From Swiss-Prot:
Organism for this UniProt entry: Arabidopsis thaliana (Mouse-ear cress)
N-acetylalanine, modified sites: 2
Sequence positions that bind Ca(2+) 3: 98, 100, 102, 109
Keyword Repeat tagged: yes
Protein name per Swiss-Prot or TrEMBL: Probable calcium-binding protein CML26
Binding-site list for Ca(2+) 2: 65, 67, 69, 76
Entry keyword Repeat: yes
Pfam family of the protein (one): EF-hand_7
SUPFAM superfamilies tied to this protein: EF-hand
One GO CC annotation: cytoplasm
Annotated positions binding Ca(2+) 4: 134, 136, 138, 140, 145
Keyword set, alphabetical order: Acetylation, Calcium, Metal-binding, Repeat
Function: Potential calcium sensor.
Gene behind the chain: CML26
Length: 163
């Protein structure tokens, strides 16, 4: 059953996207054996200007290596590439709302950004919006809570529509 999700993910991409991912995968698969090893993964990160310890690389590999064979195959590589671009977009959106860069989004920060985007809502609406995702009860939205909010757009739409 787990492979069904991966297969449907692969079917939703265009052939050109698949070809681009294959080219990138082949570039990182230095020895051409069809899989990326820990050392090749280290070279991937170095090429992007980041270096990690072997322990950190092994942790990254463990997260990506769906079939637990100690390597990243092309399917696993494609899956992580697709999901990481989404994660980057969510991080960028969080940073947009986090006006004072303290790692938390307040109701007034949400209010300012939504109003700039042309959405009409009150600070009270934003407080209610935060209340739906504020699992730690601090009255703010941290990154984890923001991810939850972004994956449930009905929270935003419902709160703003009810104003």
């Amino acid at each position: 059953m787990a492979n069904t999700n991966l297969e449907s993910t692969n079917k939703s991409t265009t052939p050109s996207t698949d070809m681009e991912l294959k080219k990138v995968f082949d570039k990182f698969d230095a020895n051409g054996d069809g899989k990326i090893s820990v050392s090749e993964l280290g070279n991937v990160f170095k090429s992007m200007g980041t270096s990690y310890t072997e322990e950190e690389l092994n942790r990254v590999l463990d997260e990506i290596d769906i079939d637990c064979d100690g390597f990243i195959n092309q399917e696993e590589f494609a899956t992580i590439c697709r999901s990481s671009s989404s994660a980057v977009e969510i991080r960028e959106a969080f940073d947009l709302y986090d006006q004072n860069k303290n790692g938390l989004i307040s109701s007034s920060e949400i209010h300012k950004v939504l109003n700039r985007l042309g959405m009409t809502c009150s600070v009270e609406d934003c407080v209610r919006m935060i209340g739906h995702v504020d699992t730690d009860g601090d009255g703010n939205v941290n990154f984890e809570e923001f991810q939850k909010m972004m994956s449930s757009p009905e929270l935003v739409k419902g709160t703003v529509a009810n104003s």
